[in-house]
């Protein structure tokens, strides 16, 4: 017989209780009442966070769920978060945490091997030991990034400004669709991990920031064209040194960028994406603004490739970026 919807399986109950920090005690009505939140509002927030639908009579919530709802209500009441952005904040946080959780469960599986699936007690014990360490590391890394981002924003931007001129870069793995068909799951996981690790290191070393990675593509942002050029060229150079990764095609565009909830938007982002789509393997294409900013720098060579045929940007001029010989 299958488990009731919204409840963990009996085999996973011990592990879930360990991870959640306590036993399930409440239905969703009871949680909402204890937190002083209408059930409809609580359900909207849970949906934004990507949580599975829970039946009315399912006892799956813990004391931590009550505390979390109360905290969010307090942030809105204190006008730290506008009511209309409540769900957006929850959604953005959940998307980040969901990916982190997938990676962390992968660590558990690699540590325990077959025991992960058959020895629930051991899995729960390992979780009990590892989780506090992971929590401390997450808090440390988050605070470090928060401090760096806050310092950068305070130093470089006008108060309240959401838009500024930056360089957007897209790096895309050539032939990724074919690789998905030909690679095993393990081979594909190693490829993606290697790509993300290499890209993240190169971007950070050259003062950029990885906005997001989506399978075969990494989106990064920098504050000037020279940094973006170094990232793009170094990525292709490093990729060429290894047999583990296919070549990349990269597009760079400079212009106004709107930053919201950790993501970036605007025509500059779209132009960089379009340039990437028409770039040749192991090459870098840049738009007019990036080319103008780099022109005259002895370390780079710019080759006009003329107008490109890309969706939504007719006659978009592009230049191939290379190092000077």
Segments from the language model and where they lie:
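Catalytic strand-loop-helix junctions within cyclic-nucleotide turnover domains
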Residues: 221-226, 250-264, 281-282
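Arg/Lys-rich, alpha-helical DNA-contact motif
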Residues: 1-34, 38-156
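Catalytic NTP-binding/metal-coordinating core of nucleotidyl cyclase/transferase enzymes
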Residues: 158-234, 238
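Short aromatic/hydrophobic contact patches that present stacked aromatics
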Residues: 217-219, 258, 318
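Cytosolic regulatory/linker segments at or just downstream of nucleotide-handling modules
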Residues: 282-325
């Amino acid at each position: 017989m299958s488990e009731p919807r919204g409840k963990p399986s009996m085999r996973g109950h011990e592990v879930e209780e360990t991870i959640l920090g306590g036993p399930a005690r409440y239905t969703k009505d009871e949680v909402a009442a204890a937190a002083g939140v209408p059930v409809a509002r609580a359900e909207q927030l849970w949906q934004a966070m990507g949580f599975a639908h829970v039946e009315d009579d399912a006892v799956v919530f813990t004391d931590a769920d009550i505390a979390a709802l109360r905290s969010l209500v307090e942030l809105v009441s204190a006008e730290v978060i506008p009511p209309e952005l409540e769900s957006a904040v929850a959604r953005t946080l959940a998307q980040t945490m969901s990916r982190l959780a997938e990676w962390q469960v992968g660590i558990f599986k690699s540590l325990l091997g077959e025991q992960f699936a058959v020895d629930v007690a051991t899995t729960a014990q390992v979780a009990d030991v590892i989780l506090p360490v992971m929590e401390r590391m997450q808090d440390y890394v988050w605070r470090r990034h928060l401090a760096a981002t806050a310092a950068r924003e305070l130093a470089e931007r006008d108060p309240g400004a959401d838009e500024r001129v930056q360089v957007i870069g897209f790096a895309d793995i050539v032939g990724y669709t074919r690789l998905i068909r030909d690679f095993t799951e393990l081979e594909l996981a190693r490829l993606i991990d290697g790509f993300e690790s290499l890209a993240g290191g190169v971007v950070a070393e050259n003062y950029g920031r990885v906005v997001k990675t989506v399978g075969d593509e990494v989106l990064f942002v920098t504050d000037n064209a020279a940094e973006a050029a170094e990232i793009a060229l170094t990525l292709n150079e490093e990729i060429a040194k290894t047999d583990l990764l296919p070549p990349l095609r990269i597009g760079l565009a400079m212009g106004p960028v709107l930053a919201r909830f950790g993501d970036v938007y605007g025509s500059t982002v779209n132009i960089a994406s379009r340039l990437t789509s028409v770039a040749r393997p192991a090459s870098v294409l840049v738009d007019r603004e990036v080319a103008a900013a780099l022109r005259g720098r002895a370390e780079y060579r710019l080759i006009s490739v003329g107008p490109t045929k890309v969706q939504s940007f007719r006659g978009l001029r592009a230049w191939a970026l290379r190092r000077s010989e």
